[in-house]
């Protein structure tokens, strides 16, 4: 299978691409700056430069490709909501349309469990109502991107698959350390739970969506087996005391931040290789 990956310099992509190559896939990478992925070229990846906002620049990279794995995204900036929406919605739409025109058969898109709000009174399932006007730009931009892809699936029969990632960590990813200061900035409750997923299981889920038949137009959550409280997470880094207020009101929604992974398990046979944060910590896989 010939696969084009975007976002190869990001947290997920920089770990996913080497694993694809090690498994013998024919991998191409679309980047804006080829110098940032020279190590992947040494491993055998084909490097193409292009811009998601310039459809003509995408054509060489898409020629002969069987499937696209679209990982590129603009995450939290707190200052550039417009840029987040442009990258995550318009960039995704442009790439998908170019891929369809180029004859690509499958398009796998990484979204986020942050598309879910609160008040579901259970772990969030893929068919929950989400708010397209979510004030969080990252969340609303991912919802909009999902909608654009599903529209292409309905109108053109394009085989799109959407994977909503829980909080991704592991493989020396600094994501946890970077996020702990945000718990205080965003006034998060210490008892709030967060669902996590190790990079190994992101890879596992992406490969399942890449290779399995009969998943056209489907959306899946991916997470591990054991959500963890924000307090526990901060405490494991010695940061709990300076992150949370000593006095807190009761937690309003104990299910906020938790997702239901039963669909992915039933449809694909997915089972997390790293079932919890504590397993990863004890096995030195953080």
Residue ranges of model-derived segments:
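NAD(P)H-binding glycine-rich loop region in Rossmannoid oxidoreductase-like domains
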Residues: 35-41, 45-89, 98, 118
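NAD(P)-dependent short-chain dehydrogenase/reductase
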Residues: 151-201
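Glycine/proline-rich active-site loop of Rossmann-fold NAD(P)-dependent oxidoreductases
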Residues: 143, 155-158, 168-179, 208-220, ...
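Catalytic helix-loop patch of NAD(P)-dependent Rossmann-fold dehydrogenases
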Residues: 120-162, 188
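N-terminal Rossmann NAD(P)H-binding glycine-rich loop of SDR-like oxidoreductase domains
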Residues: 3-23
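Mid/C-terminal beta-alpha module of Rossmann-like enzyme folds, strongest
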Residues: 2, 205-261
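Conserved Rossmann-fold NAD(P)-dependent oxidoreductase catalytic core, especially the SDR/UDP-sugar
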Residues: 93-137
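C-terminal amphipathic/interface module of NAD(P)-dependent oxidoreductases
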Residues: 242-286
């Amino acid at each position: 299978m010939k696969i084009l990956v975007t976002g190869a310099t990001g947290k997920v992509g920089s770990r996913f691409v080497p694993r694809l190559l090690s498994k013998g896939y024919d991998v191409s990478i679309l980047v804006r700056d080829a110098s940032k992925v020279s190590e992947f070229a040494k491993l055998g990846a084909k490097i193409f430069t292009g811009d998601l906002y310039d459809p003509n620049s995408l054509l060489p990279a898409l020629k002969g490709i069987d499937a696209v794995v679209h990982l590129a995204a603009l995450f939290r900036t707190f200052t550039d909501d417009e840029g987040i929406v442009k990258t995550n919605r318009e960039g995704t739409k442009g790439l998908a349309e170019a891929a369809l025109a180029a004859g690509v058969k499958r398009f796998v898109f990484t979204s986020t469990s942050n598309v879910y709000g609160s008040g579901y009174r259970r772990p969030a399932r893929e068919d929950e109502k989400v708010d397209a006007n979510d004030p969080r730009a990252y969340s609303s931009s991912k919802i909009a991107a999902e909608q654009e892809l599903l529209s292409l699936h309905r109108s053109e029969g394009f085989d799109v698959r959407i994977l909503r990632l829980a909080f991704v960590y592991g493989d020396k990813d600094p994501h946890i350390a970077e996020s702990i200061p945000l718990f205080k900035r965003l006034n998060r409750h210490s008892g709030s739970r967060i669902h996590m997923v190790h990079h190994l299981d992101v890879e596992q889920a992406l490969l399942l969506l890449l290779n399995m038949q009969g998943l056209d137009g489907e959306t899946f959550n991916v997470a591990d087996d054991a959500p963890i409280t924000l307090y526990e997470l901060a405490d494991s880094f010695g940061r709990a005391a300076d992150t949370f207020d000593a006095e807190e009101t009761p937690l309003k929604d104990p299910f906020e931040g938790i997702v239901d992974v039963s669909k992915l398990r039933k449809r694909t046979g997915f089972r997390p290789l790293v079932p919890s944060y504590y397993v990863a910590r004890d096995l030195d896989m953080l």
